[in-house]
Every structure is written in C-alpha cells, then in structure tokens.
C-alpha cells in the first residue's frame, strides 16, 4: 500500500471517528441529565418517607437538598499507525483509531434548615395553594383529608369545629362525611371553586381631582363623569375570596357575592369556605362553613400517627350524599414491615423497619396520588436550596 493511499484512508477514518464522537455527545448528555433527575427525585421521595418514620417515633424531621450539580464530559479521539503483523515488513502500515468518554460530576448537597424554612414548614397552607391543586384536577376528598385539620360549620349562628383526627370520633366522622359529600358533587362535575367577583364603587367631587390625579385614577379605576352632579364615579373590579359551591357563584346578584366575600374575609387565609345550597346537585344536605388547612409539618405528623397511634377507620357516607367513586379508609396507606417489600418501588429503612407506600391492590392509584400530592406540597413549602453561606458537602467523582 502506498503512502498517499494510507494517508487518504487515515483521513477518512479520522473524519468518521470525529463524526462518531459528535453523535455520541447528545445521547450521553441526555442519559446523564435523566439519571441525575431520577436520582434527585428519588432522594426527595425517600426523605419524605424517612421523615414520616421519624415523626412516627416522635423525632424531629430534617431535609437535605441538592444545591448544585455540575458535570464535565471529556470526549477524546486519537489516531496512529502501526506495522501490520503480516505482509512484507516495512512496506505496509495499519492505521489505528481510538476514542474515550469521561464524566466528572460534582454534586453539592446542603441541609434545608434555618428560620425561614422552619417558618414555612410550620405555617398552614393558604386557600390559594389548595385551590391551585384543586383546579389541576385534584380529588377534593384526597386534598382535604391530607391538607385540612378541621371542619368548622355554622349551626344556627354557632361555630362548631370537627377535627380531622381519629381520636375525636364524632368530629372525625362528621369531617369525613362532609368531605365525601363534596367529593360526590365533584364526581358529578357540579363542584365550583371560584373567586367572588364584584365591583367596588366610589363617588368623589370633580373639583377635588387635579389633572395629574385624574391620570392616576385612570390607571387603577374605571372613571365616569356625572355632569349634573359634577362628580366622578370610580369603579374597580375585585377578585375576592374563593368559595367552594354546588352552583355557579357568578349567577348571584352582586350584593350576594359581596356578602359572601365579606363573610369569608373574616376568616384567616388558611380557611377554605364552602356553601352547598338546596336546589342544586347535592343540595339535599345543605352545608355552610370552612375547612381550616394545616401546615406541612402537621401533615407529616398526621400520616405518621395514622400508622399505629391514631389509625384511621372506615366512615360511611351520609344518607343524603349522592353516589361517589372512592372512599379509602386511609389517607395514604403506609406499610411498616420487618423486611423490604419486593413489590414496592419506594422504600426506606428506619428504626429497624422498612417503610413504604402500599402500591398493590385496588387502591394503588389512590396511594400513589396521595404520595404525589405530599411531594407537591413539599415543593410548595421548601425554598430554593442555598448555594452559599451554609455548610455543605461536595462530592466529586
């Protein structure tokens, strides 16, 4: 083989190898991103289970987050020539090509703690976050059983509280029955969760408004001039508190919407108000009151206590409640076993036991949705993990 032909073959092979390296880079990057994403998600999920186990043993909860992931990929190619093992010695050279891919990840983890996170962990959720999850298609039965700590009902002017706690038998059963009633209305696609929309109006003398003041008013209000009275009438649309109903609240007169908003406004922001009226689906059992939401820390304690100390039990619906789809005994069925369950894809070991979510049987989907909801609520609680100024551990491979 002549030297020119050898060089030509070498150049062709080198070109092919460089193209091959370029083709390998995107798949390698994709696999790495997906692998890190799965690892971080799995880490958070297991921490949630681990903290339920800690709360089960009345120990403090704690979370650790990944603050930074940096990975460097090194793609290398090399080429050379070597004499062949056969043929006339010294006359034939064999081109040699090679390549390698190296990954050098650096992962920084830091504790999620401090006053700000602790305050968010202990602060009850507001109605806006509850409504956001409900509007994403969340089951109101699951949402309220996990997020609400009590039901408050107006009984002839008296505010009566029913706790979402199995130790309070009368309160727990009333809470479950009302939640089931709302769930039945939702299953029939007759449940509304809307803000009270209305207008506020003001009247001011025209001579009290300067040209600059008029321009400022136009930015925030709808302005109409009354030449006879020489006044300006200001109107401003208001989106008030959220109300769960079995009717369309926009069909109510404005005065009624204002009254409902003002009633809800007297309650704290972690109250979710509801109004079930006769004459509409589910109106056979008229109800009016609020659900008081709890904090993420209280949710973990509720799930932990339901394992052994305060187990939930079956509650049947009220006779006035329409048909519904699901009524699981437990908000989330947690298994505590001596050995690791083979059928579970999410298990942690703590205090000599294996904690897992029951994903077998007819309620497998319910339990998965319950854990997914817990994960989403944690994401709503935690702030961005700090990347500086806190003790951290950096792992370099």
Model regions: which residues?
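Bacterial N-terminal signal peptides that target proteins for export
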Residues: 1-11
């Amino acid at each position: 083989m002549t030297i020119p032909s050898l060089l030509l073959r070498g150049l062709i092979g080198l070109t092919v190898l460089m193209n091959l390296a370029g083709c390998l880079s995107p798949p390698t990057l994709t696999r790495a991103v997906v692998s890190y994403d799965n690892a971080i998600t799995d880490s958070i999920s297991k921490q949630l289970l681990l903290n339920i186990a800690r709360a089960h043993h009345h120990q403090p909860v704690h979370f650790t987050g990944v603050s930074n992931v940096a990975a460097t990929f090194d793609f290398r190619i090399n080429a050379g020539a070597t004499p062949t093992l056969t043929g006339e010695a010294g006359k034939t050279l064999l081109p040699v090509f090679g390549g390698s891919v190296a990954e050098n990840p650096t992962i920084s983890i830091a504790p999620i703690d401090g006053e700000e996170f602790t305050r968010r962990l202990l602060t009850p959720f507001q109605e806006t976050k509850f409504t956001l999850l409900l509007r994403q298609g969340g089951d109101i039965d699951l949402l309220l059983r996990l997020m609400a700590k009590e039901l408050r009902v107006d009984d002839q002017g008296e505010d009566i509280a029913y706790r979402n706690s199995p130790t309070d038998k009368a309160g727990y059963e009333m809470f479950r029955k009302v939640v089931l009633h709302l769930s039945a209305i939702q299953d029939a696609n007759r449940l509304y969760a809307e803000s009270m929309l209305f207008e506020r109006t003001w009247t001011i003398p025209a001579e009290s408004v300067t040209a600059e003041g008029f321009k400022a008013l136009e930015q925030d209000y709808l302005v109409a001039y009354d030449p006879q009275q020489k006044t300006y009438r200001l109107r401003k649309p208001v989106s008030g508190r959220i109300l769960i109903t079995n009717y369309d609240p926009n069909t109510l007169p404005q005065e009624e919407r204002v009254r409902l908003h003002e009633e809800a406004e007297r309650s704290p922001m972690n109250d979710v108000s509801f109004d079930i009226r006769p004459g509409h689906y589910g109106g056979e059992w008229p109800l009016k009151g609020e659900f008081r939401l709890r904090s993420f820390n209280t949710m973990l304690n509720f799930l932990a206590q339901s394992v052994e100390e305060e187990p939930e039990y079956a509650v049947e619906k009220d006779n006035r409640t329409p048909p519904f789809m699901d009524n699981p005994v437990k908000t989330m069925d947690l298994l505590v076993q001596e050995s690791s369950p083979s059928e579970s894809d999410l298990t942690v070991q703590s205090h000599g036991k294996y904690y897992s979510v029951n994903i077998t049987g007819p309620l497998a989907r319910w339990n998965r949705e319950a854990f997914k909801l817990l994960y989403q609520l944690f994401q709503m609680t935690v702030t961005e993990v700090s990347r500086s100024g806190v003790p951290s551990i950096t792992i370099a491979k």
